[in-house]
Curated annotation (Swiss-Prot):
Cell compartments where the protein resides: Secreted
UniProt record, GO biological process: L-arabinose metabolic process; xylan catabolic process
First and last residue of the signal peptide: 1-16
Name this polypeptide is given: Alpha-L-arabinofuranosidase A
Family label: Belongs to the glycosyl hydrolase 62 family.
Lineage of origin: Eukaryota, Fungi, Dikarya, Ascomycota, Pezizomycotina
EC top class named in words: hydrolase
Source organism (scientific name): Penicillium parvum
Superkingdom as given in the UniProt entry: Eukaryota
InterPro entries (alphabetical): CBD_sf, Cellulose-bd_dom_fun, GH62_arabinosidase, Glyco_hydro_beta-prop_sf
EC number: 3.2.1.55
Positions of the CBM1 domain: 17-52
Keyword terms: Carbohydrate metabolism, Glycosidase, Hydrolase, Polysaccharide degradation, Secreted, Signal, Xylan degradation
């Protein structure tokens, strides 16, 4: 995701106005619905509108808010890109950065990235692994350019949240972080300030169920207008789904689930993520797999989150992302990560015109045990 050079622009804030890159509308939003001078309230989806520089806007429309006044907004992406729409490609080809950051002293690995846009910058949480092979979690200090990730602070969380899944839940104006390995298979915490890694609420159970012969792993949350969905894997060749009415979230999904995809163990292994494709009546699911040449991702599409999924890019030789098409020279593995979202809300929107993927890679010559493999962040950018 690329933000405008005008990030450095400072606009005067008047009482009752939302700041540049602040929220200004959406269903359930009770805050300011007008922006500071020079910024326009920009529609992203029914739950989220954001103050963006007016110079990036083209066409006006009305946003959905519960306010008594209606704000004139424009159709532009939350990443301040063009208003054009794109389809997902049938064949993917990427370019890749090198390693973007190294773990601090005492740690061997940075993994499982979850990234959201936040006030015009990137906010990233991740799992970390220390020299003894023990897992924890951290946040990176805010940064505007991916090349600056290497110098961003790494802020260890006092309460570990392994495999974090971070988003803004607009209906209740809170930030949510889901994760694994707690009192229940999946847990969640909430916060009003996601930049404070130790400002999260006490953990609550997100899912209490079990799966035969394995354990639930890698929670992925996404919502439509009426329903919140939980997708997860099991390192066993299956992908699972649970759901609840959106008005009940955040709370425990309980123990019930549906198996929605089945294949061999390595063909549907872990790290499932689900996104809404902007400008299309389509959702994208990616799943990490194990191949002859390392970790790679297969992709599936659907027209509804509660519906069936159609294979899209599913072979190791022509994957969604892997050694065959990543363009990376420093890693064979394209492993657990997050597509860069165009806004941070619970609908998980991605812009296929500007698709990027924050992933974990590693030196392929490393022979350490899995927990001690030297994973680092890298960024793929789709070649169109």
């Amino acid at each position: 995701m690329m933000w405008l050079a005008s990030l450095s622009l400072v606009l005067p804030v008047v009482a009752g106005q939302a700041a540049l890159y602040g929220q200004c509308g959406g269903n359930g939003w009770t805050g300011a619905t007008t922006c500071v001078s020079g910024a326009c309230c920009t529609y992203s989806n029914a739950w989220y509108s954001q103050c963006l520089p007016c110079s990036t806007t083209l066409t006006t429309t009305k946003s959905s808010t519960t306010s008594s006044s209606t704000t004139s907004t424009v159709h532009s992406t939350s990443t301040a890109t063009s208003t054009s729409t794109c389809s997902l490609p049938s064949v993917y080809k990427w370019t890749s950065t090198g390693s973007l950051a190294n773990p601090e002293s005492g740690f061997v690995s940075l993994k499982d990235f979850s990234a959201v846009p936040y006030n015009g910058q990137h906010l990233v949480y991740a799992s970390d692994v220390n020299n003894a092979g023990n897992y924890g979690s951290l946040s990176f200090g805010l940064f505007s350019d991916w090349n600056a990730m290497s110098s961003a602070s790494q802020n260890v969380m006092s309460h570990g949240a392994v495999a974090p899944n971070l988003f803004y839940f607009a209906p209740k104006n809170i930030w949510v972080m889901a994760y694994e390995w707690g009192a229940s298979p999946f847990m969640y915490m909430t916060s009003s300030d996601p930049t404070n890694p130790n400002g999260w609420s006490s953990p609550q159970s997100l899912f209490s169920g079990s799966i035969s012969g394995s354990s639930p792993i890698d929670p992925a949350l996404i919502a439509d207008d009426t329903t919140m969905y939980l997708f997860f894997a099991g390192d066993n060749g299956h992908i699972y789904r649970s759901s609840m009415p959106i008005g009940d979230f955040p709370s425990n999904f309980g123990t019930s689930y549906t198996t929605i995809l089945s294949d061999s163990t390595y063909n549907l292994f872990e790290a499932v993520q689900v996104y809404r494709v902007k400008g299309q009546n389509q959702y994208l699911m990616i799943v990490e797999c194990i191949g002859a040449n390392g970790r790679y991702f297969r992709s599936f599409t659907a027209t509804s989150l509660g519906g069936s999924w159609t294979p899209q890019a599913t072979s190791e030789s022509a994957p969604f992302a892997g050694k065959a098409n990543s363009g990376a020279t420093w890693t064979n593995d394209i492993s657990s990560g997050d597509l860069i979202r165009s806004s941070p809300d619970q609908t998980m929107p991605i812009d296929p015109c500007n698709l990027q993927f924050l992933y974990q890679g590693r030196d392929p010559s490393s022979t350490a045990s899995y927990n001690l493999l030297p994973y680092r962040p890298g960024l793929l950018t789709l070649v169109r």
